[in-house]
């Protein structure tokens, strides 16, 4: 009887000691709205559409992002400007379906789609999670500051022939390579 009483008392004292020691340890829980959450540098959050250094939107409506998306949350319609360049007449992302996998960013040849570390996108209604082009387009170039798709590839620049643009090689006559 005394043995069980001593064992019970020791167990209670040991428990109180552990509680007392844990009271002074660093807390594991973050008080989220007051304390910022640490995100890894490669965190994939909200999708944005960027502009090139000239201020034009980078998206050329190639539709590769919509094809690469495993949940089909991206839809767009191609239009053509007077100078022959393509642009998206509308660009829509349904964030209630998006799994933030980043495949659209990898598929984009112009670096127009980029994922930001913004993760606070909660809404009361699902319809408000469908973002249009005006909601997605930002004013800056995003991660690639000096990249301009039309300076590297695409349509020729007025006043310059083929092979004279920046980082462009002279054209090769493919038929001359045949045996």
Curated annotation (Swiss-Prot):
Keyword Metal-binding set for record: yes
InterPro entries reported in the protein's UniProt record: 4Fe4S_Fe-S-bd, 4Fe4S_Fe_S_CS, NADH_quinone_OxRdtase_chainI
Main localization (coarse): membrane
GO biological process assignments: aerobic respiration
Binding annotation for [4Fe-4S] cluster 1: 59, 62, 65, 108
Cofactor: [4Fe-4S] cluster
GO terms of molecular function: 4 iron, 4 sulfur cluster binding; iron ion binding; NADH:ubiquinone reductase (non-electrogenic) activity; quinone binding
Regions that span the bilayer: none
Subunit structure, as described in the record: NDH-1 is composed of 14 different subunits. Subunits NuoA, H, J, K, L, M, N constitute the membrane sector of the complex.
Family: Belongs to the complex I 23 kDa subunit family.
HAMAP family: NDH1_NuoI (MF_01351)
Record protein name field: NADH-quinone oxidoreductase subunit I
Source organism of the structure: Chromohalobacter salexigens (strain ATCC BAA-138 / DSM 3043 / CIP 106854 / NCIMB 13768 / 1H11)
Lineage, highest ranks first: Bacteria, Pseudomonadati, Pseudomonadota, Gammaproteobacteria, Oceanospirillales
